[in-house]
């Protein structure tokens, strides 16, 4: 084991023990979870993730309603769950016991530098779901995203109509450039600005040189360079389990949450959802419902459960011998955000480094005050939303996640699943001072699918995102390369002796000259990562639209008493990280289910 990895392991162990002693109250919380369940409930929620936890809280407010949540993962109160609580440690939560550890099928147009050409696709398998293992970044998306949903037939989902639900959830810690009218101060979800070092100011100044402003990207204008907003409260991750689920579990007897409950299928009789079959402790069990079943298992698992229940593409279901209940395009329209990373080295130790993150001083600072670099969400302190497509000058097409430190070879191999035959290309990266800019394609034109691997619910589905299948996606990433090079020429970057860190890549040099468009098109097909935002596999829209699975009320077409409430319903992927939109979807769905009149649209904002 390399020295860096050994030091990291030692520090994680120290941190786990000390944090457990100082902050842990797991036994008390765990005792509130259901040990067994009743035969029947009014509502059954499958999945306690970003949207499911919100639903569980809102539906159980009425003490006359019995609500059951079935979560395939464990609770988040185990000693090992320390890795979930400390914001800087989020990379270690992925590929852990709290992750489904999905991977795509081999990709034709990207991932050539990854093991088996497969994209890792982390998804949270724990109370709180992916809000527990993501990078905490809080982005709502662009107002045009939601207005386009509305124009496409999703009545009630325009920006002015969904904004009140974003505000409802939020408990923002005020920051310098905050546009107050766009934020909430009384909701359960803790949100704060991530500004630990001078790195956000550095990025903002560089952006100004290229004509970009700053402010509040969750306010009136998304375009610009900013300090990141994150679901971090008092130095700890604020997952939806912490914000919404645990307070309800502890205080409400009508809410039952069963962990390690892996759903096999929804039971449907005469086009009505009447119950759920699930595995718990190795035994197949069933539970009935009086009102509705809500799938909130995410854009990869919800379509799998639907297809196992007989709802999906007819020919695919027949291939697996599953009786067809409803012929719907379940699992189609998969969209995800793909990235490439630009590495910069600096003359001096300007912001932070991987070694500093591992230092005992950082640990001591965090444990005594819950401040310092360990509160930075995966090192992300700054975001930018830039426009490189002349056809949409005010609608950002790329997002930059700016990470204030360098990674090292071990982290790249572990998290990115780098193919070892390309190890020399990243050798030495951990020994330099610098930072990383991760460019994210916001509106990919490429669409993929989720399909069944077998009729065994315990097997992972077949996930084929078809990244970069559409040429326009590669064109967008190439424009990002050129923008990144332009950033390096700014006075701000030059003031710190900033240089682009890139070893010319031999397989691409064999085909083209270094720094040519052809070189970068080749390179961008090797070292990609996703930011793990799968969406769209149970698409929302007009009932008569043959590409949709749910109507604007999130009801599965042709099936009574069954809704989908998660990222899978998005008709098109949002321009940014998907956790905040999923929470909004949960809030809005709760009002729909309970028949509560929606808040007045905020049309003047």
Regions found by a protein language model. Give the residues of each.
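N-terminal redox-cofactor-binding region of secreted/periplasmic oxidoreductases
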Residues: 2-605
């Amino acid at each position: 084991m390399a020295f860096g990895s050994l030091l990291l392991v030692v520090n994680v162990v120290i941190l786990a023990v000390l944090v457990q002693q100082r902050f842990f109250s797991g036994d008390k919380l765990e005792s509130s979870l259901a040990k067994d369940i009743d035969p029947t409930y009014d509502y059954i929620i499958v999945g306690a993730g970003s949207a499911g936890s919100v639903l569980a809280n809102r539906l159980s407010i009425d003490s006359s309603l019995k609500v059951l949540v079935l979560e395939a993962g464990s609770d988040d109160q185990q000693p090992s769950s320390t890795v979930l609580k400390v914001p800087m440690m989020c990379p270690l939560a992925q590929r852990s016991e709290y992750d489904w550890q999905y991977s795509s099928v081999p990709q034709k147009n990207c991932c050539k530098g990854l093991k088996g050409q497969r994209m890792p696709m982390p998804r949270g398998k724990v109370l709180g779901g992916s809000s527990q293992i993501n990078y905490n970044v809080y982005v709502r998306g662009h107002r045009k995203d939601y207005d386009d949903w509305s124009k496409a037939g999703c009545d009630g989902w325009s920006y002015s109509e969904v904004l009140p639900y974003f505000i409802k959830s939020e408990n923002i810690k005020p920051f310098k450039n905050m546009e107050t009218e766009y934020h909430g101060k009384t909701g359960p979800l803790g949100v704060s600005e991530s500004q630990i070092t001078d790195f956000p100011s550095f990025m903002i100044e560089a952006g100004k040189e290229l004509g970009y402003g700053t402010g509040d990207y969750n306010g009136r204008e998304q375009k610009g360079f900013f300090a990141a907003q994150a679901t971090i409260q008092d130095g700890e991750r604020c997952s939806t389990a912490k914000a919404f689920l645990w307070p309800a579990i502890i205080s409400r007897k009508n809410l039952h949450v069963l962990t390690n409950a892996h759903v096999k299928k929804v039971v449907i009789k005469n086009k009505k959802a009447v119950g759920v079959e699930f595995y718990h402790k190795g035994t197949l069990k069933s539970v009935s419902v009086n009102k509705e079943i809500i799938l909130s298992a995410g854009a990869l698992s919800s379509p799998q459960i639907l297809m196992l229940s007989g709802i999906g593409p007819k020919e695919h279901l027949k291939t697996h011998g599953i009786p067809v209940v409803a012929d719907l395009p379940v699992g189609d329209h998969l969209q995800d955000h793909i990235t490439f990373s630009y590495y910069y080295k600096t003359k001096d130790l300007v912001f932070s480094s991987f070694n500093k993150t591992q230092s005992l001083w950082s640990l001591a600072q965090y444990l005594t005050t819950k401040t310092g670099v360990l509160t930075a969400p995966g090192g992300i302190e700054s975001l930018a939303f830039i426009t490189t497509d002349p056809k949409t000058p005010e609608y950002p097409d790329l997002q930059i996640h700016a990470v204030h430190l360098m990674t090292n070879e071990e982290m790249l191999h572990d998290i990115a699943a780098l193919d070892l035959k390309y190890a020399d290309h990243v050798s030495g990266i951990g020994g330099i001072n610098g930072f990383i800019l991760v460019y994210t394609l916001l509106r990919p034109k490429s669409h993929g699918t989720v399909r069944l691997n077998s009729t065994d619910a315990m097997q992972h589905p077949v996930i084929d995102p078809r990244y970069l299948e559409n040429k326009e996606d590669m064109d967008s990433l190439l424009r990002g390369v050129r923008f990144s090079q332009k950033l390096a020429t700014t006075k701000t970057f030059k003031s710190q002796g900033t240089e682009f860190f890139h070893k010319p890549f031999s397989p691409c040099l064999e085909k083209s000259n270094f720094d040519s468009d052809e070189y970068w098109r080749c390179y961008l097909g090797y070292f990609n990562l996703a930011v793990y935002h799968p969406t769209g596999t149970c698409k929302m829209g007009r009932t008569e639209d043959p590409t949709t699975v749910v109507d604007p009320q999130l009801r599965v077409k042709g099936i009574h008493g069954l809704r989908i409430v998660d990222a899978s319903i998005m008709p098109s992927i949002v321009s940014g990280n998907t956790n905040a939109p999923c929470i909004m979807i949960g809030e809005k769905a709760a009002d729909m289910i309970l028949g509560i009149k929606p808040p007045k649209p905020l049309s003047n904002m």
